[in-house]
Amino acid sequence: MAEKKFVVDTNWCITLDKVDEKFYPEIIKNEAQIAEWREMYAIHEIEGNLTTVGYSEPLTIEFLRQNKNLILDTRHFSADFKERLIASIDNLDEQTGGLLIHSENFQALRLLNKKYKESIDGIYIDPPFNSTYSEILYKNNYKHSAWLSLMQDRISQSRFLLCREGLITIAIDDYEMPKLWELMNNIFGYDNHLGTVTIRVNPKGRMTARKISAVHEYTIVFGNSEYSYIKKLPVNPEDKTHNYKLDENGVWYLPVNLRKQGVDSEAERADGTLLDRYYPIYYDPKSGLVSTKRKLPVTILPIDNNGHKRIWRRSKDVIDDMYARGEIWVKEVKGEYQVYFKFYGGLDGKMLQSIWVDPECSASDYGTKILNNILGERERFLYPKAPFAVKQNILAMSDKRNAVILDYFAGSGTTGHAVLDLNREDSGNRKYILVEMGEYFYTVTLPRIKKVIYSADWKNGKPQNRNSGVSHIMKYISLESYEDTLSNIELDDDKHQLAMKLGDEYMIH
């Protein structure tokens, strides 16, 4: 049995709106914290005006009051300050929206099982692909058996954390897709496979000497039980890509062509007779009048551009009433008259489709570039996923605005970024748990989350909108490493006592 790993360091990142102002005098004297704010948030560029206070040296309490989305990191403060601050926050467990764990993920999963057993709503992971194309900490080019062993141990352990209705989604490429498919079927069962999505993540294609240039990856989705299902993606009627309109009563509708297309739209039966929904609609271009009973100058039949007879989406007996209510109209499209109607529906969501070609799924354009703009450096982390694609996966896994999402191959922290973005968009209270073993935990993963909490938009490492921050508490901990165990690490007494107290009492809070 693997030896228990101890929590060797525990800290919190807390937005100032959640910090009692009695701590402000101590905060403005903390040079390490202020230096981080200058480097991370460029607070020295904040200028004052008639109503606001700008940056100054020394920093003022009023400046803190007016910039309450700044994130305090307890690692810059004494053990005494940390204890007093944490003790002053009511309902710390409920208010903590994120947990970051610097650890080998198998040990972290075992530790998480103490508090989160059967309570995680969704797991999203982007593990090593076991190919030369994914350069990450785990040694790629494993033999199949070694890679499968790595994955089986972690996926099996993480299943204990999923709630009954929970889902797990895994990003993978062609190289290990067949083996992963077999593994997931063995762990979750064939009947709990809810679909596989093909995502265009590299529109330019992957350089190759002999093979087809791959532009895609996959996301495999499995449910934890028969009660698991894919959620519909929310539809925002104000999003112009959906073409929703407001009627005169302020109700959203979608303009839809009355002529049906696709499955079950053929008007002719096998014997050559026509279905009842193949009928003429009469139209007067001058008055705009539409009727099925009164013959008018123009006769419109549901015949498509290829001359195929289709059917209307509505029966003949309701058309005149719909016109009287202002729900039917005709417009000329490319020289032909088309009949449209107001569709009052669809806002309950849309089904997730198996192919994603959205430009926002591009890892280079919407993964790497976004991360570079946040961190202000190029290529500090290779091949990060696009937040949009991860957000889609999260929404498909859970429609709960207080869902708990786990990623135990956290990498650059895209999953945490996606959760924060979703909460910012719909005022949700989702929580994220990220596990990462790499040293870039402190140079990429943690800084990224701290920056995304502060602002939604970044360019060249600087915030572009200081008013887009979210109120938040995030906790990050480090577990004892295998090397620490071998070395029989000894902590400074004060730090050891604090780590034991906070790491035990508040470990997963």
Predicted segments, located by residue:
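Conserved P-loop NTPase mechanochemical-coupling segment
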Residues: 84-100
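Conserved beta-strand signature within the Rossmann-like core of class I S-adenosyl-L-methionine
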Residues: 166-170
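Conserved RecA-like ASCE ATPase "motif II neighborhood" in helicase/translocase motors
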Residues: 101-118
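Accessory, often C-terminal, charged low-complexity segments
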Residues: 1-79, 97, 113-117, 155-159, ...
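Active-site-adjacent "gating/activation" loops or surface patches in catalytic cores
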Residues: 90-92, 104, 120-133, 347-385
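Conserved proline-anchored active-site loop of SAM-dependent methyltransferases
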Residues: 118-133, 184, 405-419
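Phosphate/oxyanion-binding active-site loops and adjacent basic polyanion-contact surfaces
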Residues: 101-105, 143-151, 381-389, 441, ...
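Mobile active-site "lid"/loop adjacent to the S-adenosyl-L-methionine
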Residues: 121, 128-150, 165, 175-176
